[in-house]
Amino acid sequence: NKKSEHFWWFSQLEMKKDQNGTHEIQKGIVIYNSPYTSENQFTINYQQQIRDSISKMYLKGTTKDSYMISRNDDLAPMQSEAMYINDKYVFKTTGAWKMVNDKMGGPFINYAFLSKNNREIINIDGYVYAPNFEKSKLIRELEAIIYSALN
């Protein structure tokens, strides 16, 4: 777990067996905030940019010069949805992440919303790394945790 003034990272590691051996599963939630300056911050492009800059700074891999970034290509396009949750505007982004200079990746889900004083955007990001295992249940678990934080 890592923490700074505008960044919190919580992760859970577990080992799980399948027919090919034992594999690491990681579920993580990352919370970060940034100044709110424009409605344009609630776009896929901006959300990818801020997510990738935070990830490059804090979500490092074990391989030298490795860090997490979002994928947004033909094979793994990011998707977004604007919604209201308890009268709060929320911009939801889903997609896939990968490690630069390493061979890791998986799904992520991100919720961006304004702080109570409307001066900051708060992002709550959940990601899963689970090679050889179904990831949809794991990402739904994180989504439930994130959703409860929005209530």
Give short role names for the model-derived ranges.
Residues 14, 34-37, 96-99, 126-132:
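Short, flexible beta-strand-to-coil junctions
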Residues 2-60:
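Secretory pathway targeting signatures of secreted, lumenal, and periplasmic proteins
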